[in-house]
Amino acid sequence: MNVARLIVCALLALPVGWIAAVLVDRVPERRSLLVPRKPLRPSPRDLVVHLLVLVLFVAAAVRFADASLGTLGAFLVLFAALAALTVIDVEHYRLPDLIVLPTFLVSVPLVVVVSVVDDDPDRIRYALAGAALYFGFLFLAHLISPRGMGFGDVKLAAVMGLYVGWLGTDLQEALALVLWAMLLGFLSGTVVGLVLLVARRGSRPFPFGPFLALGTVLAVLFSEALVGV
């Protein structure tokens, strides 16, 4: 374990958590991000966002203890975005383009630059293949059932597939890990959906994005156990 990275990531989670909480509060209602927040007591939602960011950042520090700083930084970007989007989807049942698209536009050049700096340019190809696979699979699901699979989930899939595929040491491992991320996301979502159905709450809106995010996080953190990378 790299203790220095662990401490830095834990400290970094504080300002990033604050930024994520601002996004969660303002983006769904399209309020300006430039107006300072009033110094009010943190809401329970703010605390959830901060806790999610902290847990994910610490997990990233442990997972990427021996990776390059660029790789760690890139996954911190992903985890921060997933934390904010998860809370928004649970509360508003949507994944705003104002977070998803900038995350993708930042992530693609970030993946390219880090791969080149780390002298492993093949990873760029694996990342793009992962993004295409995840996006394509969910786009097909969206065409089959638009109400069951929203297009926000489809766009987020491109972001998640980019990062998950990036972890592969060859194309086969990259695609296998993306399939694992999808499987874990769909399984967790299906289980919770069945529980809600049994509890007679199945008629309520059901956000699927948080479960796709969970599957991605699990695939990233346990990639070695899943595909050996």
Predicted regions and their residues:
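A membrane-topology feature that recognizes alpha-helical transmembrane segments
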Residues: 1-229
